[in-house]
């Protein structure tokens, strides 16, 4: 139950941060959602930082890791999770695996988003 709450509370905070970044930054340049870009870049940076920190501090309770990584950064951006998976593969020397993960996520996401967008026409 503690893990469930850690993820949930972290996700709420991350989602509020993402929303706030959008409100603050998106009006500056409407053609490029800067709030989303900021959320993805900030999330990517912080997931790298906390992954390294948790690796150096193995005694930290798993609920803290769940709150920060799965909850907070996952709520801020799922891009941070994707980035962590690719960087983890690359730091293990798995260059092909890391590249395939990156390609699969990017291509899959773009294709799925396009399909979702255009499928609305058929659902009406």
Swiss-Prot record:
Regulation of activity: Na(+) is not transported, but it plays an essential structural role and its presence is essential for fluoride channel function.
Catalytic reaction list: fluoride(in) = fluoride(out)
Single Gene Ontology MF annotation: fluoride channel activity
Listed transmembrane segments: 4-24, 34-54, 67-87, 100-120
Binding site for Na(+): 74, 77
Family listed: Belongs to the fluoride channel Fluc/FEX (TC 1.A.43) family.
Protein known as: Fluoride-specific ion channel FluC
Organism: Thiobacillus denitrificans (strain ATCC 25259 / T1)
């Amino acid at each position: 139950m503690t893990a469930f709450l850690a993820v949930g509370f972290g996700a709420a905070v991350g989602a509020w941060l993402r929303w706030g970044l959008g409100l603050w930054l998106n009006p500056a340049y409407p053609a490029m959602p800067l709030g989303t870009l900021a959320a993805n870049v900030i999330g990517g940076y912080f997931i790298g930082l906390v992954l390294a920190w948790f690796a150096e501090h193995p005694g930290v309770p798993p609920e803290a890791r769940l709150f920060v990584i799965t909850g907070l950064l996952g709520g801020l951006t799922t891009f941070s999770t994707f980035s962590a998976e690719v960087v983890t593969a690359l730091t293990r020397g798995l260059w092909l695996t890391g590249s395939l993960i990156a390609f699969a996520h990017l291509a899959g996401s773009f294709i799925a988003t396009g399909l979702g967008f255009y499928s609305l026409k058929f659902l009406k």
